[in-house]
């Protein structure tokens, strides 16, 4: 079970145009993410994860948008060898919560493990890093060159 609370720490850029700061109150900045993560490792090479999710925004941008969004994500990892593998994730949005065109989030990645590091190169159509950003608000498709490149380095160590 995973739950997260996120707080927006940015200025409302539309305030100069309309005179109203939508982030004036602290609780307007909060969003909540809840997931039930079910995962299994099938042998040494393949792992699979299914995660139904729920996102709630205390305040949305447009009054016609819903505050609650839900869907389900699936992720996988396949290791070709002890050092090289491929990952993937797809998130399906179930309800129609906005008039804007948002798309399902999808990402693929390659990973290389060395003695103490894990290097990942990722391609995705999402912009946000946190679940409350990329699950409901992916506004690019793979078919219209809306692809983003990401890179992670992980270090494993023991105390």
Q: Residue spans of the language-model regions?
A:
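Surface-exposed substrate-engagement region within the catalytic domains
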Residues: 81-83, 90-115
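Outer-membrane pore/translocation modules
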Residues: 1-67, 134-144
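Outer-membrane beta-barrel "beta-signal"
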Residues: 108-117, 121, 126-128, 144-159
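Membrane-embedded beta-strand positions of outer-membrane beta-barrel proteins
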Residues: 1-3, 34, 50-52, 76, ...
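A mid-sequence, solvent-exposed acidic-amphipathic segment
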Residues: 49-91
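Residues that define the transmembrane beta-barrel architecture of outer-membrane proteins
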Residues: 26-32, 66-72, 102-106, 113-115, ...
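Repeated loop/turn-to-beta-strand initiation elements of outer-membrane beta-barrel proteins
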Residues: 45-48, 82-88, 116-120, 157-159
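Outer-membrane beta-barrel pore domains and translocons
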Residues: 2-6, 53-55, 91-93, 124-126, ...
